[in-house]
Amino acid sequence: MFMGEYSHTMDAKGRVFIPARFREELGEKFIVTKGLDHCLFVFPQKEWKVIEEKIKALPFTNQDARAFVRLFFAGAAECEQDKQGRVLLPNHLREYAKLDKEVVIVGVGTRVEIWSQELWNNYCNGAQAAYEEIAEKMVDFLL
């Protein structure tokens, strides 16, 4: 299970360190795709297969489903760690997530998210203000 928040600096080539705690669980190769809220989602191969099957089950006759499937899969890339635990993020994904130099890597249960420091701070400031309200709404899903 992925959890925690780690700040790193992306180098000029677009490489970012994967926290040591995440490296083994992600495996040598993993999938990076466009996430929600302008972050990147990072899935281990095993989890990607689960997500892939669920997404493939969406009805292709539904316009929103087709759009989601296209964007989700078109933005995906198989990436791998180098010997130093870095990953080279494809340019189109760096642009989507507005990644510059300072990045935040967040463990979110079954996936990892990569955020620009600025977008992460903005997101946290907004979500933190509504945390209790959001928690109350989520209780319904757990029961």
UniProtKB/Swiss-Prot annotation:
Superkingdom, taxonomy of origin: Bacteria
Record localization: Cytoplasm, Nucleoid
Domain SpoVT-AbrB as annotated: residue spans: 5-47, 76-119
An individual GO BP term: negative regulation of DNA-templated transcription initiation
GO cellular component, one term: cytoplasm
InterPro entries: MraZ (IPR003444), MraZ_C (IPR035644), MraZ_dom (IPR020603), MraZ_N (IPR035642), MraZ_sf (IPR038619), SpoVT-AbrB_dom (IPR007159), SpoVT-AbrB_sf (IPR037914)
GO molecular function, one term: DNA-binding transcription factor activity
Alphabetically ordered keywords of this record: Cytoplasm, DNA-binding, Repeat, Transcription, Transcription regulation
Main subcellular localisation: cytoplasm
Family designation: Belongs to the MraZ family.
Alphabetized PANTHER family for the sequence: TRANSCRIPTIONAL REGULATOR MRAZ (PTHR34701:SF1)
Subunit structure: Forms oligomers.
Name used for this protein in its record: Transcriptional regulator MraZ
